[in-house]
UniProtKB/Swiss-Prot annotation:
Signal peptide start and end residues: none
Name this polypeptide is given: Photosystem I assembly protein Ycf3
Cross-referenced SUPFAM superfamilies: TPR-like (SSF48452)
HAMAP family xref list: Ycf3
Length: 167
């Protein structure tokens, strides 16, 4: 039974009902409907911390989905899972793939910046200042791109850029 049919969460149930209605009303192919169902089930599993199940659903959605814009969100969510699992290199790969298909994803730039900043902090702890500066510079580049797309967001990042004279 698909995850969307066994949700106990009121919000997930409501989302599922609305999504099902939209899928019936909006003219889409069976393949697109299946891709969306897997994507929706992936989001549900991800929100419950069931990352392995979420990844299975996202990979199946990727197999079916042909629209680059829709694929970008699937790839972005796969990146989120890898970030949560501490697999930062993999996460960045997926964020970059998402951005190739949809360059207007400020959240992907932000997440890559957060990873780079974290890696910079790790290098500081190891007293490797050259490496830390390289990571911080990369974080700054990603944050600048995120801010360019969403100027009213990422205030903390904007302050960090100003305080470190990277803006």
């Amino acid at each position: 039974m698909p995850r969307s049919q066994r949700n106990d969460n009121f919000i997930d149930k409501t989302f599922t009902i609305v999504a099902d209605i939209l899928l019936r009303v909006i003219p889409t192919t069976q393949r697109e409907k299946e891709a969306f169902t897997y994507y929706r089930d992936g989001m549900s599993a991800q929100s419950e911390g069931e990352y392995a199940e979420a990844l299975q659903n996202y990979y199946e959605a990727m197999r079916l989905e042909i629209d680059p814009y829709d694929r970008s969100y699937i790839l972005y969510n796969i990146g989120l899972i890898h970030t949560s699992n501490g697999e930062h290199a993999k996460a960045i790969e997926y964020y970059l793939q998402a951005l190739e298909r949809n360059p207007s994803l400020p959240q992907a730039f932000n997440n890559m910046a957060v990873i780079c900043h974290y890696r910079g902090e790790q290098a500081v702890e190891k007293e490797d200042l050259e490496t830390s500066e390289a990571w911080f510079d990369q974080a700054a580049d990603y944050w600048k791109q995120a801010i360019a797309l969403a100027p009213n967001n990422y205030i903390e990042a904007q302050n960090w850029l100003k305080n470190t004279r990277r803006l």
